[in-house]
């Protein structure tokens, strides 16, 4: 599976997170880990 860097950015919530995610993993599932 390919690997992607996924950035979750929300200035309102003060969130700026970069996670590694595979294309066979749902983004929400990866963010919860």
Swiss-Prot record:
GO terms for cellular component: chloroplast. Belongs to the 2Fe2S plant-type ferredoxin family. The keyword DNA damage does not apply. Its main location: plastid. Its cofactor is [2Fe-2S] cluster. This is Ferredoxin. Keywords: 2Fe-2S, Chloroplast, Electron transport, Iron, Iron-sulfur, Metal-binding, Plastid, Transport. The keyword Acetylation does not apply. Residues 3-33 form the 2Fe-2S ferredoxin-type domain. One of its GO terms (molecular function) is 2 iron, 2 sulfur cluster binding. It is found in: Plastid, Chloroplast. It comes from the Eukaryota. Binds 1 [2Fe-2S] cluster. Ferredoxins are iron-sulfur proteins that transfer electrons in a wide variety of metabolic reactions.
């Amino acid at each position: 599976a390919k690997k992607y860097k996924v950035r979750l950015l929300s200035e309102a919530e003060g969130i700026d997170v970069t996670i590694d995610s595979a294309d066979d993993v749902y983004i929400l599932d990866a963010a919860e880990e």
